[in-house]
């Protein structure tokens, strides 16, 4: 079957989904979560095949981490589906309701987008997360994962499709593209009369490819070059906690810290404590001359280091004379993803928040909270640094649009 035929089937199934009640969608998502539990052994076995093949190819640590499913991670995926199931249904929400002077009633109502294409690599959890969010919002979803996760994605999709069938919903509402040729992906991205939105998740190369070749709208973020600025008034212990969690808890995540900026007035107190905590987590440090004056044992940082998304246990450090210099650095090297300030000065916190255009800005909180689940959205479908209808971590509302519904009693304009 051609990719266009698959997309047309998904569009027809999306029409069925759009008519389901909130209760029916909740029951469906709970059944999908249960299907993952039922098929857990097969899913983990399939994932192990993918991981083994990736290791044989010499895949890097960051990609391997994203690819790997453990029993705990798979359980967390099911838990995320259950969280999405009980979230308020955005479809049908009325966001405006007023009566015009001529008596017509004007409402703005949330409706599904239609068909969403997810293009991703080495992230089998996205198969379930994306399906759950799209279906909850009444959309069909076309999933095109990477070849490195094909066995994992297929096992997850089969479990979820079984739940759809048993609920009387066409399984085409969740369509997994098994033809992984690049030409097929290109054809999918050209289907502007069928596909309403494409969301790429993966490496910068994949995301740029999708953005450059798609004829459908694309919501994306290229990379996550996230910063922590430690202000002169920062609590040292607090800032160290933010740094270690942001850098070392899961360095392959796009919300992990890549660069540390330290105010010169606190550098001699903060940097030794930070270095000791990071060395305990095997983090490689690279710094500018002012940083190396305090930490002479670390390597010199290059200009490329400050622009890098390491996705690894590597951190670039720079000492700055003031907040304005820190903000200028972030504007030059940042990716509009997530930025953090550690400070006890409210005015500096407010300046930091108001001066940056990043999708998420944090004060005295870890960058790792830049996640749909942590921000109360349920499982996220992606993070947008595209200033369109959604900005930042994207949950259910980002998968709907508002339309006008007008009710009258025969009013005419002229």
Swiss-Prot record:
Keyword field contains Cytoplasm: yes
Molecular function via GO: glutamate-5-semialdehyde dehydrogenase activity; NADP binding
Primary localisation category: cytoplasm
Catalytic reactions of this protein: L-glutamate 5-semialdehyde + phosphate + NADP(+) = L-glutamyl 5-phosphate + NADPH + H(+)
Sorted UniProt keywords: Amino-acid biosynthesis, Cytoplasm, NADP, Oxidoreductase, Proline biosynthesis
Pathway where this protein functions: Amino-acid biosynthesis; L-proline biosynthesis; L-glutamate 5-semialdehyde from L-glutamate: step 2/2
Family statement: Belongs to the gamma-glutamyl phosphate reductase family.
Xref: Pfam families: Aldedh
Localization terms from the record: Cytoplasm
Protein name: Gamma-glutamyl phosphate reductase
UniProt-listed HAMAP family: ProA (MF_00412)
